[in-house]
Amino acid sequence: MIISAKFITSLVKFDENLSSNFSEVAFLGRSNVGKSSLINSLCKQKNLAKSSATPGKTQLINFFEVICKRNEEKFNINFIDLPGFGYAKVSKNLKEIWNQNLDEFLKLRTSIKLFIHLIDSRHTHLEIDVNLNDYLKRFLRPDQKILKVFTKCDKLNQSEKAKLKNEFKDSILVSNLNKFGLDSLEDIIINQTLGLDK
């Protein structure tokens, strides 16, 4: 279980050097899909990760040190909150630089053990999400895993939830509003970062 968390730093550039001795979990998704809210819910802190009301406004890479406990043993992992994509109103040139830097960051950062791909449960087949999933699969290492996490599932009825879970069997459905699915997600994060989830 996660017992505490704190903000470490924000990086403007993906190539800024921030070494890590801990396994890391990267949170990716479209702008306003609920990345910051999910991190806050997992860490049981209301304002740990700052969310923006303006889609695409958050352009920093935010690092959080998370202390977990399993079988009475404590260990550290890092959460990485990556900039949301899909709405950022920036110049084409700047967007290309971001994409190149992000590409290098994700491919070369060997400490990342789990990619959490957040998808709005009401919009499950957007091209931008399909492309992201295909992109991650191209360089995924044996010690890494991609986990689809469908957010805002409180907006769905039971039939819609069952249909979604049947289509994406290895996914997790969560709701920050009623805390649905958070315990299951926490277990996967801990097992994957410890190398137990094969």
Curated annotation (Swiss-Prot):
SUPFAM superfamilies: P-loop containing nucleoside triphosphate hydrolases (SSF52540). The keyword Calcium does not apply. It comes from the Bacteria. Its cofactor is Mg(2+). Residues 21-195 form the EngB-type G domain. Keywords: Cell cycle, Cell division, GTP-binding, Magnesium, Metal-binding, Nucleotide-binding, Septation. One of its GO terms (cellular component) is cytosol. Mg(2+) binds at S36, T58. GO terms for biological process: division septum assembly. GO terms for molecular function: GTP binding; metal ion binding. GTP binds at residues 29-36, 56-60, 81-84, 151-154, 174-176. Necessary for normal cell division and for the maintenance of normal septation. Belongs to the TRAFAC class TrmE-Era-EngA-EngB-Septin-like GTPase superfamily. EngB GTPase family. This is Probable GTP-binding protein EngB. It comes from Campylobacter jejuni (strain RM1221).
